A protein has these predicted regions:
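Glycine-rich, acidic loop regions that bind phosphate or pyrophosphate groups
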Residues: 1-27, 184-205, 236, 241-246, ...
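Active-site cofactor/cluster-binding pocket
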Residues: 1-120, 190, 194
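Beta-sheet entry/capping signal
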Residues: 9, 157, 172-179, 215, ...
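Flexible loop/turn segments at secondary-structure boundaries
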Residues: 19-20, 166-167, 181-182, 188-190, ...
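Ferredoxin-like iron-sulfur electron-transfer modules
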Residues: 100, 144-167, 184-225, 245-253, ...
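Segments forming glycine/polar-rich beta-alpha architectures that bind adenosine-containing cofactors
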Residues: 114-181, 186-191
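Iron-sulfur cluster-binding cysteine motifs and their immediate structural context
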Residues: 144-146, 170-192, 219, 228-252, ...
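Cofactor-binding active-site loop characterized by glycine-rich and histidine/acidic residues
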Residues: 257-463
Length: 463
C-alpha cells in the first residue's frame, strides 16, 4: 500500500542465484547487490562505479585468493548491473486493506500487545498505557520473545540423514542459534509426536542409560543457513560415508517447523537422566536458555553463550558488557534468553557504562550477603525445631550449585506448612536467593582486553 501511494520504483533481484551462477556461492552477493545499487541510483557515473569496484576486487582478493577469485567477483559486478527486475505496482494496492496477522501459538498478552507490534515496526504507535498495563515501565522485559520471531531468512537449511549420523551432537553444540537440536523419546512417547517425526535407536548415551529413540531436528524458520553445523559434522568431513547433514532448499524443509515446535521445544521431552556436562554429546540434550538470537549467521559469541546457558541456565545471572553480545542479548523486543516450564531461566542485565566486570562482581557480593543472612536465620530456626531435617539438608548443601536447587525446593515446601513466624516469612519472601546462582560477566574482546580490562584485573585480584 505504501509503495503504491508513494509511487515508488520497486525492483527485485535474485542475488543468491546469480552468485551461484557466477561460481562464488550463494552467500557472496555483495558485488552483485552493490553493482545493482549503482546502476539504479546513479549516485555516481556507472562507469566510474564499475571501475572502482573492480579495482577494489583486485586489492581485496588478488594477494590472498588469486586472479581467479578476482575474475569471479568482476563477473559478479557485470551481472549485477543489469540484474534488477522492475516490479510494476498495481494502482489497486493503494487501497489494499490491512490483513489480520495470525497470532503465534502460546503467545502471552505481553507478546501480543507489545512484542508483535514492535516486531512489525509499529512500536511508535504503542501508548505508554500498554507498558503500564504489563508492568514494564522500569525497563524489565518478558524473556523468550525471540521464539515468536520466525524470520525464515535462510535459502537453504540442513536436512538430517539418519543413516549417516553418528549421534555425536556436535552440530547442535556449534549452532549459534539453537536451531538444530537432538531429541530423545521413550517408546511410549513415539505415539505422542507427529508421524513425520521419524527416529532411530539412540546410541552412546552411557551404559546405564535407558533405551531411547533419537532424532536431530532443525527449525527451518530460525536457521540462518550459516553452515557451521555441516563443518562441525564428522560424517560430513569423512569420505567414507554420505553426509549426515545436507543443505536443502527452505521450501522443501519448512514443513519441519511443526516437528521442532511441538517436540524439540517441548520441555516434557527433555531427558534429564542422560544430561550431564561431562561430554559434548550428553550436554546437548539439555535445554538451551539462549535461543534464536538476532546475531549474524555463524556468530561464535552466541555459541558460547548458548552452551553456558545449557550448563547453568536455570540458575544463571549474567552481567553483559556493551558490544555485539549486549545487542543480541537485550535488543527489545526480541530477547533470546528464555525460561523453562517451571519459570526458571537466566536473569540478564546490561550496565550503561563500561564497567561490566565490577557490575557482575556486584551481583556476586549482593547474592553472597543476602544468602549469608538467610543462613543465619535458618540456623536459628533449626535450633528452634522448625523444619530441622530440611534446614540441616539445606545447610549441608547451600553452597553447592547443583544440589542447592533441590534442597531449596524441599525447604520451601516444608516452610510453607509451618507456622508463619517472622523468620519463616522472611525466608519465604526471599526464596529466590536460597539456591546458589552461577554469576557471569559476559562481553567481547573490546571490553575484555581494552576498555574494561582494568575492571577484570580488579575483580580477578580480589579472588
Amino acid at each position: 500500500r505504501d509503495l503504491a501511494r508513494k509511487h515508488a520504483n520497486f525492483y527485485i533481484i535474485d542475488a543468491a542465484k546469480l552468485a551461484v551462477q557466477v561460481g562464488l556461492g550463494e552467500k557472496r552477493t555483495n558485488n552483485i547487490l552493490q553493482a545493482a545499487f549503482f546502476a539504479l541510483t546513479k549516485v555516481i557515473p556507472l562507469d566510474m562505479a564499475v571501475e572502482d569496484m573492480k579495482k577494489n576486487n583486485y586489492n581485496s582478493y588478488f594477494k590472498k585468493a588469486g586472479q581467479k577469485i578476482v575474475d569471479l567477483n568482476d563477473k559478479a559486478v557485470d551481472l549485477g548491473i543489469s540484474a534488477a527486475v522492475k516490479v510494476e505496482i498495481p494502482a489497486s494496492w493503494a487501497d489494499a486493506p490491512d490483513t489480520p496477522m495470525a497470532e503465534p501459538k502460546n503467545a502471552s498478552a505481553f507478546v501480543r500487545d507489545i512484542v508483535l507490534p514492535m516486531d512489525r515496526q509499529q512500536g511508535d504507535k504503542l501508548p505508554v498505557s500498554v507498558f503500564q498495563k504489563h508492568g514494564v515501565l522500569d525497563g524489565t522485559w518478558e524473556n523468550g520473545t525471540s521464539a515468536f520471531s520466525k524470520r525464515g531468512v535462510a535459502t537453504k537449511v540442513p536436512k538430517w540423514n539418519a543413516e549417516s549420523c553418528i549421534q555425536c551432537n556436535r552440530c547442535a553444540m556449534c549452532c549459534p542459534h539453537a536451531a538444530i537440536r537432538p531429541v530423545l523419546l521413550a517408546e511410549e512417547e513415539k505415539a505422542q509426536v507427529p508421524a513425520s517425526f521419524e527416529t532411530v535407536p539412540a546410541k552412546g548415551l552411557g551404559k546405564d542409560a535407558p533405551s531411547y529413540f533419537f532424532r536431530m531436528q532443525v527449525s527451518p524458520y530460525d536457521c540462518l543457513g550459516c553452515g557451521v553445523c555441516l563443518t562441525a559434522c564428522p560424517a560430513n568431513q569423512s569420505d567414507k560415508t554420505a553426509d549426515a547433514l545436507v543443505m536443502t532448499p527452505f521450501e522443501e524443509m519448512k514443513s519441519e517447523q511443526a516437528n521442532f515446535d511441538e517436540v524439540a521445544m517441548n520441555d516434557k521431552y527433555l531427558k534429564k537422566d542422560v544430561i550431564n556436562s561431562k561430554t559434548v554429546k550428553n550436554m546437548q540434550f539439555a535445554k538451551p536458555y539462549f535461543q534464536f538470537s538476532a546475531a549474524c549467521a555463524g556468530c561464535a559469541e552466541t555459541t558460547y553463550i548458548k552452551l553456558l546457558s545449557q550448563m547453568v541456565g536455570d540458575r544463571m545471572y549474567a552481567g553483559n558488557a556493551a558490544g555485539c553480545s549486549s545487542a543480541i542479548s537485550g535488543g527489545a523486543p526480541i530477547l533470546p534468553y528464555c525460561k523453562d516450564s517451571q519459570g526458571r531461566g537466566p536473569a540478564w542485565e546490561h550496565s550503561l557504562f563500561e564497567d561490566n566486570a565490577e557490575f557482575a562482581y556486584g551481583f556476586f557480593h549482593a547474592q553472597d550477603a543476602i544468602r549469608k543472612e538467610l543462613l543465619i536465620r535458618l540456623e536459628s530456626m533449626k535450633d528452634a525445631g522448625i523444619a530441622p531435617a530440611e534446614i540441616e539438608d539445606y545447610i549441608n548443601n547451600w553452597n553447592d550449585g547443583e544440589k542447592s536447587r533441590a534442597v531449596s525446593d524441599a525447604l520451601i515446601a516444608a516452610l510453607e506448612k509451618c507456622e508463619q513466624t517472622e523468620d519463616v516469612s522472611y525466608i519465604l519472601e526471599n526464596r529466590e536467593y536460597l539456591s546458589k546462582k552461577s554469576i557471569w560477566a559476559i562481553g567481547g574482546d573490546g571490553w575484555a582486553y581494552d576498555i574494561g580490562f582494568g575492571g577484570i584485573d580488579h575483580v580477578m585480584a580480589q579472588n
